[in-house]
């Protein structure tokens, strides 16, 4: 993968930086693993906006991703790497020895023709999935489960990874990219290696329209609104809002703590760093 800067032939291309990946499949995705993905425009069943800044965008199918990796002991071969419009990471179509095909998140360095496997006896190599109880301390992993059998929930986006710091009986200690150190059950599964397409964070869309293609609408500042629309609205001339930053509903924002799940606080060894 490489970054490509464009010549400034127009205002929209002047700041455009694209991620070029010649290894991705050029054709259509694997149809049996596609599902309809209807757009809501941010509206609920009453037609009211429940999520702002959503609307428009290109039609997409949802790719069914195997986040559980439960086909233990059956070797698989990577058929191809594909683009997925629903996530920042690329995905890989793998063919198992029993004839079944599944999509997985493509780890860094994975390419067509590579062999992967899952299960407690899987070799220690990138792309293989196994319980963290069976992984060496210090391993870099992604697609990490929080509960055994629930499916991966942590480190699924492009370039993400988690490091196994220690193993102590029933739990392993993980260091997340945010700096948080937390404990997870040792029987939870993870995939070795880090997620590929790390250059995704270095791209530049170049123009506002590129965000509209992705279904993202503009964000209007509260201080530019009227008092009826936002707590920061109104005033004569340009103002700073006149109070600490809040959401349109008066909730503190920009740094206010939002974590409410005290039940799982006991698993957090060290809180994340800013």
UniProtKB/Swiss-Prot annotation:
InterPro entries: NA-bd_OB-fold (IPR012340), Rib_uL2_dom2 (IPR014722), Ribosomal_uL2 (IPR002171), Ribosomal_uL2_bac/org-type (IPR005880), Ribosomal_uL2_C (IPR022669), Ribosomal_uL2_CS (IPR022671), Ribosomal_uL2_dom3 (IPR014726), Ribosomal_uL2_RNA-bd_dom (IPR022666). Residues 28-53, 223-274 are annotated as: Disordered. Keywords: Ribonucleoprotein, Ribosomal protein, RNA-binding, rRNA-binding. The keyword Endoplasmic reticulum does not apply. PANTHER family: LARGE RIBOSOMAL SUBUNIT PROTEIN UL2M, RIBOSOMAL PROTEIN L2. This is Large ribosomal subunit protein uL2. GO terms for biological process: cytoplasmic translation.
